[in-house]
Structures are given as C-alpha cells and as structure tokens.
C-alpha cells in the first residue's frame, strides 16, 4: 500500500468553515447566522445552504448556530496585526 491519499474526513485549509459577516441575537444561547454571500456553495459545515438560480449562483447559509465561525479573511492576511 504505497498510496498516500488524503482522507475526506480531514478538512483542508480552504474548506474550513468560516464567516466574515455573522449576526447573533442577544438571547441565551445566542442564535447566530452567517450572512456571507458565496458563489456556488456554502462553507463546509453548512447544513442548510440556500442558493439563487442565477449563474453563478449566490449562496447563503441558513443554519442557526450558537456561535460564529472564524472570519475567513484573517487566515490569509497578517497585515492587520501591524497597526
């Protein structure tokens, strides 16, 4: 067995769930929704992804969670820390 293939269980960096625009209610526990618009897909952990019928499709995740995912932008730019 000389084949080394990545299993699909292992999330790659790009498929990690993330959200830049997250809105939460003030209830306990909070009800949070990611309002990011993505093209053709939602983040990897999204259970209820709603897309427009346009091309490319604009998709938003309709899940309600009690937390927000990491922001998508932060992983790529470290420039924000230098201010």
From Swiss-Prot:
CDD domains given in the database record: BBI
Alphabetical UniProt keywords: Disulfide bond, Protease inhibitor, Serine protease inhibitor
Gene Ontology CC terms: extracellular region
SMART domains (UniProt xref): BowB
GO molecular function, one term: serine-type endopeptidase inhibitor activity
Site feature (Reactive bond for chymotrypsin) residues: 53-54
Disulfides per UniProt: 18-72, 19-34, 22-68, 24-32, 42-49, 46-61, 51-59
Site residues (Reactive bond for trypsin), renumbered to this chain: 26-27
Cross-referenced PROSITE patterns: BOWMAN_BIRK
Protein family: Belongs to the Bowman-Birk serine protease inhibitor family.
Other comments on record: Several variants were isolated from a commercial Lima bean preparation. Some lacked 8, 12, or 14 N-terminal residues and 2 C-terminal residues.
Full protein name: Bowman-Birk type proteinase inhibitor
Native source species: Phaseolus lunatus (Lima bean)
